[in-house]
């Protein structure tokens, strides 16, 4: 800690998923803007995706090299585009990087470490170097509180049964892998120094933040949605094409369709989404992720020709924040990853929830509970069907029945704008106090 000006240095270690790298990077930018020296540590492949977006001299990108193998070469040291069967090997490789990270911490000697739910060794290694560590929770308080409640109060009813009713659920013994993940998750809360940072805001899930604070016996400090500035860097040709297309559409008449950076739709799912968009008659931009080697014959034959200029299909990555922040965008067909929900709320765009797995169904339910989204209902076989997709798109974007949802999304966005960056300011105050307390103990 710089004694002359109170400037602190902070190291950040996110998990290797884009949905974690992105909020950690946005947090790093906010801390750097407030006169902190920041070190963001991750694998070279993850850092390469943000190098061009880093304009602050106060953020240093620090490479963490994982052990490589023929099955897990360096370009797979990220969950972005990672084949599902390599997810566990990647986690295992990350778990073995503790000694390497220990050397990095020894060299950097930061005043504080901000860590993620994985790897499990981060707070212990920080402690071995006499560095305080704070957990940064990048998922919703609502979904996180369910797991922590079940662990702390087994057999007891969850306090908000309208959101999650566990009264008729008989828990099954978790597998060894899931048990380890659960214990690692609990340890993240227990090892955090005094507070827990959370990517959230009270206007969306205040009661769940309070519940999680009680369950963890730690002060939860929201840092807001941490959405990247959509105008923060130069536009590439693809972005330019998309924005030009949006500029020609009327206000709030376009749905953006995106299912995240890690999930590939099956051919059947692609067809249902495509026909759903077609019969909805609503304008759309669809970011389609295609598995390498399977690029032909996936979208229904003639689909692109039939929708014509009403739809824009973009292969691979799309500038999500730029699209959601555009005045023509009036709905977001989303997999309901927490970062996507936060971005949608930041820009006042209602969510059409097509959740996939993990915490996503709960995130979609939360958006619906608050009144800023609507869930697409699965059929009796657990599948999304074209008619249901089209119906919810039209309700949310076009029909009079969706006006309440559209208004609530706008109102929530306005509240967040009025609040500005108060959450980050308070979070930094808490972090400085932790560093001062540690220094006084030495």
From Swiss-Prot:
Keywords: Glycosyltransferase, Isoprene biosynthesis, Transferase. The keyword Glycosyltransferase applies. Expressed at higher levels in roots than in leaves. One of its GO terms (biological process) is response to molecule of fungal origin. The active site is at residues 20, 116. Induction: Induced by methyl jasmonate (MeJA) in roots and leaves. Induced by A.niger mycelium-derived elicitor, thus improving ginsenosides production in adventitious roots culture. Component of the dammarane-type triterpene saponins (e.g. PPD-type ginsenosides or panaxosides) biosynthetic pathway. Glycosyltransferase that catalyzes the conversion of ginsenoside Rh2 to ginsenoside Rg3. Triggers the biosynthesis of ginsenoside Rd from ginsenoside F2. PANTHER family: GLYCOSYLTRANSFERASE. This is UDP-glucosyltransferase 29. It comes from Panax ginseng.
């Amino acid at each position: 800690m710089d004694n002359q000006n109170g400037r602190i240095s902070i190291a950040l270690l996110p998990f290797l998923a884009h949905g974690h790298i992105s909020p950690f990077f946005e947090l790093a930018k906010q801390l750097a803007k407030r006169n902190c020296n920041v070190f963001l540590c991750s694998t070279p492949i993850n850092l390469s995706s943000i190098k061009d977006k880093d304009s602050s001299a106060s953020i240093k990108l620090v490479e963490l090299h994982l052990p490589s193998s023929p099955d897990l070469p360096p370009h797979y040291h990220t969950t972005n585009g990672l084949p599902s069967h390599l997810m566990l090997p990647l986690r295992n490789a990350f778990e073995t990087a503790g000694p390497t990270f220990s050397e990095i911490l020894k060299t950097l000697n930061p005043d504080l470490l901000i860590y993620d739910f994985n790897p499990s060794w981060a707070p212990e290694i920080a402690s071995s170097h006499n560095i305080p560590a704070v957990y940064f929770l990048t998922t919703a308080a609502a979904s996180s509180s369910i797991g922590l409640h079940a662990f702390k109060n087994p057999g007891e009813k969850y306090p908000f049964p309208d959101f999650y009713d566990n009264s008729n659920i008989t828990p099954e013994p978790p597998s060894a892998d899931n048990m380890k993940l659960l214990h690692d998750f609990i340890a993240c809360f227990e090892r955090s120094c005094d507070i827990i940072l959370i990517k959230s805001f009270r206007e969306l899930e205040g009661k769940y933040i309070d519940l999680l604070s009680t369950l963890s016996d730690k002060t939860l400090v929201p840092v807001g949605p941490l959405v990247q500035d959509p105008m923060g860097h130069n536009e590439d040709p693809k972005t330019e094409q998309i924005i030009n297309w949006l500029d020609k559409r009327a206000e709030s008449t376009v749905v953006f369709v995106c299912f995240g950076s890690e999930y590939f739709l099956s051919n059947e799912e692609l067809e249902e989404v495509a026909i759903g968009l077609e019969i909805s008659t609503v304008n759309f931009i669809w970011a389609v992720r295609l598995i390498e080697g399977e690029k032909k014959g996936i979208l229904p034959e003639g689909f692109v020709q039939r929708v014509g200029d009403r739809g824009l299909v973009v292969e691979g990555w799309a500038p999500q924040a730029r699209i959601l922040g555009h005045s023509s965008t009036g709905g977001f067909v989303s997999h309901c990853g927490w970062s996507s929900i936060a971005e949608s709320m930041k820009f006042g765009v209602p969510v059409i929830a097509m959740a996939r797995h993990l915490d996503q169904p709960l995130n979609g339910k939360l958006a619906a509970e608050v009144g800023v989204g609507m869930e697409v209902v699965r059929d009796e076989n657990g599948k999304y069907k074209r008619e249901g997709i089209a119906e919810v798109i039209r309700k949310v974007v076009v029909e009079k029945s969706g006006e309440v949802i559209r208004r609530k999304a706008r109102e929530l966005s306005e509240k967040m704008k009025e609040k500005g960056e108060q959450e980050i300011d308070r979070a930094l105050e808490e972090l400085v106090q932790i560093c001062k307390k540690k220094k006084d103990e030495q």
